[in-house]
Regions:
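C-terminal segment of N-terminal export signals and the immediately downstream linker at the start
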Residues: 27, 48-81
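Short, gly/Ser/Thr-rich active-site loops of penicillin-recognizing serine hydrolases
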Residues: 381-443, 509-535
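N-terminal secretory signal peptides and thylakoid transit peptides that target proteins
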Residues: 15-41
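Central antiparallel beta-sheet cores of small beta-barrel/beta-sandwich binding domains
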Residues: 430-496, 522
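Short, conserved catalytic-motif segment at the N-terminal edge
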Residues: 65-122, 142-144, 158-159, 195, ...
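Short, well-ordered beta-strand elements
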Residues: 366-369, 373-383
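Short, glycine/proline-biased beta-turn/loop segments that scaffold the active-site neighborhood
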Residues: 145-161, 250
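Short, surface-exposed loop or secondary-structure junction motifs
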Residues: 96, 103-107, 161-361, 365-366
Length: 535
C-alpha cells in the first residue's frame, strides 16, 4: 500500500480558496485513511480491508496509491470554467474505497452541494443493476438465460419477420444482440402519462430488425423486455424488484428508481451543456437508465462485482453467477465484447477490464473495473457534456495505477467505412416499414456507392446522405414523415437507416430522430423489410 508519506496524500482537504465551493473529504474516507495507515504501520498484520476480499491474482504492475490532488484540480478547474456543475468520484483499490469525494452543485438552485452520498442519475449504468436482478432469478431457476425471452413474456411478445423471434434469448436481450433496434425517448412531467409500461412498449416497438445474434446494436428495448420478464415471473413491479433483490441486500441505501418520487429531491438535478437546468424527465425504458445512485453506492456495487465480499452485504449471488454476468456474449472487431449487462475487454498485457458508461440529457457517468488488480473507478456528473471530464478523470486515475491503461470504446460494432455498392445492395427495393401504429410502403433505390433515395408511402423520393458501411450493413441518413402517432407527436423526421442482407432481402430499421441530445431528444425505431423490386 506504500509508506506513510505516500498515504498522507489522501488528506484531500480543500485549500482556503476552495473551501466555500468544495466540501471537505468525507468522514467515511478519513476512516479508510486511518485504517490503511494503521495497517501499514504494523507491517501488514491487519488485512488490506475489513470490507472485503478478491480472490483473483494480480497480473499487472500496480503502483502505490497515487496523489489524487492533480485529479481534484482537474475537476475544480472544470467547475470554475463552467464546464461542469456537479461531480462525484470514488476509487477502489485493494478491497476498499481509497478515495471518494463530491465537488460542485448537486442542485445549484436549491443550494445542494455534491457529496459522495449524493444520488445521481446513472443513465445506462442502470443496465448492470437490471442484469444483476435478472441473474438472481436465474440463480433461483425462475428463468434461464438461454431460453427465448418470449417464454417469460405474458402480455406482449417479441415479434417480427426479420429472423426468428425465439432467437431473442434472455441473455441476448441483455447483451445488445437480440435483433431489437435501439430506441430512446424522454418525457417531462407534463408528458408523464405518455410514458409506456414495458408491456406497452413491447407491443409498439418489440419487433426484431435483424436476425437475433447476427449483429450488435446498442438497445434499450431489450432491457424493457427484461423488466417485463422479471415482473411477469415474480408478480412484482420492476423498481420494487431491483430494490428488494439488489439495492437493499447490498446496502446501497442512497439508490432508488426515478419512480420513487419522494426521494427525487435528494438526487442531483440535471444540467445542459451551458449549465442551464433541465426539467425533470423520465424515459420510455426505465430499466435501461432511470436508477439513481451515489458514487459511494456504485463503488460498493463494483466491490460486489469484483467478488470483494463486503461485510454487511448479503450474498445475493454465488461467485459463479457473478462470473456469468461478466462472461463475453458477443465479441466485436476491436476485441471489446458485450456481456449480460456489461462490456468487457483486455489491455495489451492481457489484464481484463469490465465497464459501463451512461449518458443522456444532463447525465454523464462512467464505471471501470479491473478485477485482477482489485481496482475500480467511478465518476458521476450531472451535465450533458460531462463525458470528456468523466473520461479524463477516470483515465488519469487508472493510469496512475496501471500506466498501460487506455480507455476502450463502448461498442461491439464495426467501425464505419465508405460504402461501396455490391450486388447484395445495388438496385431497387420495395417493402414495408412497421412499428407503433405505422405500416407504410417503402421504396429504396441504391444507384451507386454515393447515390441512393428513399420513398415513404406516397411522398416524393428523398436523397440518402452519409452513406457508409458498418461491417455487412449499409447506413445512411434521409428525411421524411412516418405515419405513426409517436413520430407525429415528436416531429421526428430525420431518418437514420441501417440495413443488412438476409435471405435475399434487406432487413433493418429506420430511426426517426428529433430534438437536442443535450436537452431533450427522441429516437424512434421502425422496422424495414425489403424485397427486390419486380417492376
Amino acid at each position: 500500500m506504500g509508506d506513510a508519506g505516500e498515504l498522507r496524500t489522501f488528506d484531500l482537504r480543500a485549500s482556503s480558496e476552495n473551501r466555500e465551493s468544495t466540501p471537505l473529504i468525507t468522514s467515511t474516507t478519513r476512516r479508510e485513511v486511518l485504517r490503511t495507515l494503521l495497517s501499514a504501520s504494523i507491517g501488514g498484520i491487519l488485512p488490506a480491508s475489513k470490507y472485503g476480499r478478491n480472490d483473483t491474482k494480480s497480473s499487472a504492475k500496480v503502483h502505490a496509491e497515487p496523489n489524487f490532488e492533480s485529479v481534484r484540480n482537474l475537476i475544480l478547474q472544470a467547475i470554475s470554467h463552467g464546464k461542469a456543475t456537479g461531480v462525484a468520484v470514488a476509487v477502489l483499490h485493494g478491497g476498499s474505497i481509497v478515495w471518494e469525494e463530491g465537488f460542485g452543485w448537486a442542485n445549484r438552485e436549491a443550494g445542494l452541494k455534491v457529496t459522495p452520498r449524493t444520488p445521481f442519475t446513472l443513465a445506462s449504468i442502470t443496465k448492470p443493476f437490471t442484469a444483476t436482478t435478472l441473474m438472481t432469478l436465474a440463480a433461483e431457476s425462475k428463468l434461464s438465460l438461454d431460453e427465448p425471452g418470449n417464454n417469460y413474456l405474458a402480455k406482449s411478445k417479441i415479434e417480427g419477420a426479420n429472423g426468428n423471434p425465439d432467437g431473442a434469448t434472455v441473455k441476448r436481450l441483455g447483451a445488445h444482440i437480440s435483433g431489437l433496434p435501439t430506441m430512446y425517448e424522454g418525457f417531462d412531467r407534463g408528458e408523464a402519462t405518455l410514458a409506456p409500461s414495458p408491456d406497452a412498449l413491447l407491443m409498439n416497438y418489440g419487433r426484431i430488425a435483424y436476425p437475433p445474434g447476427s449483429c450488435y446494436e446498442y438497445g434499450n428495448i431489450g432491457f424493457a423486455a427484461l423488466a417485463a420478464i422479471a415482473s411477469n415471473v415474480t408478480g412484482t413491479d420492476f423498481g420494487t424488484l431491483v430494490t428488494q433483490r439488489v439495492l437493499t441486500p447490498l446496502g446501497l441505501h442512497d439508490s432508488f428508481f426515478a419512480s420513487s418520487v419522494a426521494r427525487l429531491p435528494t438526487g442531483a438535478a440535471r444540467y445542459d451543456s451551458s449549465g442551464n437546468p433541465i426539467p425533470f424527465y423520465t424515459t420510455s425504458t426505465p430499466a435501461s437508465g432511470e436508477l439513481y445512485a451515489s458514487a459511494h453506492d456504485v463503488a460498493h456495487f463494483a466491490m460486489f462485482n469484483m467478488r470483494n465480499h463486503v461485510q454487511g452485504q448479503a450474498s445475493i449471488l454465488d461467485d459463479r453467477w457473478i462470473d456469468e454476468l461478466h462472461k463475453p456474449v458477443f465479441v466485436g472487431p476491436s476485441g471489446v465484447a458485450t456481456t449480460f449487462g456489461w462490456f468487457t475487454g483486455h489491455l495489451k498485457s492481457g489484464v481484463p477490464f469490465i465497464f459501463k458508461n451512461g449518458g443522456q440529457p444532463g447525465v454523464a457517468t462512467i464505471l471501470y473495473m479491473l478485477p485482477s488488480e482489485n481496482l475500480a473507478c467511478v465518476v458521476l456528473t450531472n451535465r450533458s457534456d460531462g463525458r470528456e471530464l468523466c473520461s479524463g478523470v477516470c483515465n488519469q486515475l487508472l493510469a496512475s495505477y496501471i500506466p498501460e491503461w487506455q480507455q476502450p470504446e463502448e461498442t461491439a460494432g464495426p467501425s464505419p467505412s465508405p460504402f461501396v455498392v455490391t450486388p447484395s445492395f445495388g438496385g431497387r427495393w420495395q417493402g414495408t416499414l412497421t412499428n407503433d401504429s405505422a405500416k407504410m410502403p417503402v421504396s429504396l433505390n441504391i444507384e451507386s456507392s454515393d447515390s441512393a433515395t428513399l420513398v415513404l408511402g406516397d411522398k416524393p423520393a428523398e436523397r440518402i446522405t452519409g452513406m457508409q458501411s458498418e461491417g455487412v450493413a449499409f447506413t445512411g441518413v434521409s428525411t421524411g414523415f412516418i405515419d405513426s402517432s409517436d413520430a407525429i407527436r415528436t416531429g421526428a423526421k430525420t431518418l437514420k437507416i441501417k440495413l443488412m442482407p438476409y435471405e435475399g432481402k434487406l432487413v433493418g430499421r429506420v430511426l426517426a430522430t428529433s430534438g437536442n441530445p443535450n436537452i431533450k431528444n427522441v429516437m424512434l425505431p421502425y422496422v424495414l423489410t425489403l424485397n427486390r423490386a419486380t417492376h
